[in-house]
C-alpha cells in the first residue's frame, strides 16, 4: 500500500536505506542506513542572522574547549506518531523512548561519542540494545558550534532495529542543536538559524534563539522552532510513489544550557509537535499524522 509511516524530516537519517535486500533487516522490520558499516551523514549548512545583539557587554560566542576535553552527558529522546488513514481507526506508530548515556571527547575533527548502556521501556528494543554497548558516534563541528556532519559506528553485534533507533535519536538531536551568531552579542540577544532538514520532504527549519542569561561561559538559551516543507510533494522512500501535502504545521520550543568549555549541552529540553495531512493523488486516500518529538540533555 502506498501509505507509509514516516516522521517527515525526523527519520531521514534512518530511512535513506539501500535496496532492501538484507534478510536481517527484514527480520527486524527496520532497515537502517549503512547497514553493518560506519556511516557519515553531512548536515546542511546553517545560515545565521542576528536579529538583536542584546545588552552590553557583548562578546563573540565561541566553543572554547581544548582537544581531549571529556564530558559525560545523557541524551533522551521520545518520538510519538498517531496516524489515521481516511476514517479508519487511529493507530500508534510511536518510536520507543531512548535514554542514551555517553562520553564525549573532543579532538581536532569535532566530538567523538562512546555510548554506554542505552535503555528504553520497550522490552523487545531493550533486548536488542544490549548488544549496542560501546557503539561510537561523532559530530563534526563548525567554529560557530554548529554540527556539520553526523557519524555512527555501531558495535559489531548491534541489530538493525537497535541501530535504526539510535540513528533516529541522534538525527533528532542534531536538528535541535544551536549555532552561534558571527558577531558579538549580549544577554537578550536574538538570532535566527535557518537550515534545510533533508528527507523525503525537504523542510525549511527556522530556529529563533534568545540568550536569556549568561554566567561566564555558561549560557541559558531559549529556542523556538518552526518547520515548513519546501515542496508540496512527499517522495516516498524506495520509489514507492508520492503524496500531495495538503497541510503541514510543525513548531515547538524549549530551553537549553550550554557551557562554552564543553562540546554538548549540559541541560535542557526542546519539544516539537504538530500535524500533517497527505493525499494519495492516485486514490484520493488521506493520511493524517499527529507528531510530537522531545529531546533533552542532562546528567
Regions found by a protein language model. Name each.
Residues 17-127, 193-299:
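Acidic, serine/threonine-rich low-complexity disordered tracts
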Residues 157-212:
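Extracytoplasmic beta-rich ectodomain segments of secreted or membrane-anchored proteins
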Residues 122-165:
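Hydrophobic alpha-helical segments and helix pairs
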Residues 1-9:
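Sec-dependent N-terminal signal peptides
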Residues 62, 128, 180-184:
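Short, surface-exposed secondary-structure edge patches
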Residues 11-16:
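C-terminal motif of bacterial Sec signal peptides marking the signal peptidase cleavage site
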Amino acid at each position: 500500500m502506498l501509505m507509509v509511516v514516516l516522521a517527515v524530516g525526523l527519520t531521514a537519517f534512518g530511512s535513506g536505506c539501500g535496496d532492501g535486500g538484507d534478510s536481517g533487516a527484514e527480520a527486524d522490520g527496520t532497515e537502517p542506513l549503512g547497514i553493518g558499516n560506519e556511516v557519515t551523514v553531512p548536515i546542511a549548512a546553517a545560515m545565521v542572522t542576528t536579529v538583536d545583539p542584546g545588552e552590553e557587554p557583548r562578546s563573540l560566542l565561541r566553543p572554547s574547549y581544548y582537544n581531549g576535553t571529556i564530558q559525560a552527558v545523557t541524551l533522551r529522546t521520545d518520538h510519538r506518531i498517531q496516524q489515521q488513514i481516511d476514517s479508519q481507526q487511529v493507530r500508534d506508530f510511536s518510536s520507543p523512548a531512548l535514554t542514551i548515556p555517553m562520553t564525549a571527547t573532543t579532538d581536532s575533527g569535532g566530538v567523538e561519542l562512546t555510548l554506554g548502556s542505552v535503555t528504553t521501556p520497550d522490552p523487545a528494543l531493550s533486548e536488542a540494545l544490549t548488544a549496542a554497548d560501546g557503539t561510537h558516534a561523532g559530530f563534526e563541528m563548525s567554529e560557530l558550534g554548529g554540527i556539520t556532519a553526523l557519524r555512527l559506528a555501531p558495535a559489531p553485534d548491534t541489530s538493525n532495529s537497535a541501530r535504526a533507533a539510535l540513528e533516529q535519536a541522534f538525527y533528532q538531536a542534531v536538528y535541535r542543536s544551536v549555532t552561534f551568531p558571527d558577531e558579538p552579542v549580549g544577554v537578550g540577544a536574538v538570532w535566527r538559524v535557518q537550515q534545510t532538514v533533508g528527507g523525503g520532504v525537504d523542510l525549511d527549519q527556522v530556529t529563533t534563539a534568545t540568550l536569556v542569561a549568561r554566567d561566564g561561559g555558561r549560557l541559558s538559551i531559549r529556542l523556538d522552532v518552526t518547520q515548513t516543507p519546501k515542496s508540496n510533494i512527499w517522495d516516498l522512500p524506495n520509489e514507492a510513489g508520492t503524496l500531495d501535502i495538503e497541510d503541514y504545521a510543525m513548531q515547538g520550543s524549549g530551553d537549553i544550557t550550554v557551557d562554552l568549555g564543553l562540546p554538548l549541552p549540559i541541560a535542557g529540553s526542546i519539544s516539537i509537535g504538530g500535524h500533517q495531512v497527505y493525499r494519495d493523488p492516485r486514490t484520493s486516500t488521506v493520511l493524517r499524522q499527529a507528531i510530537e518529538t522531545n529531546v533533552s540533555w542532562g546528567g
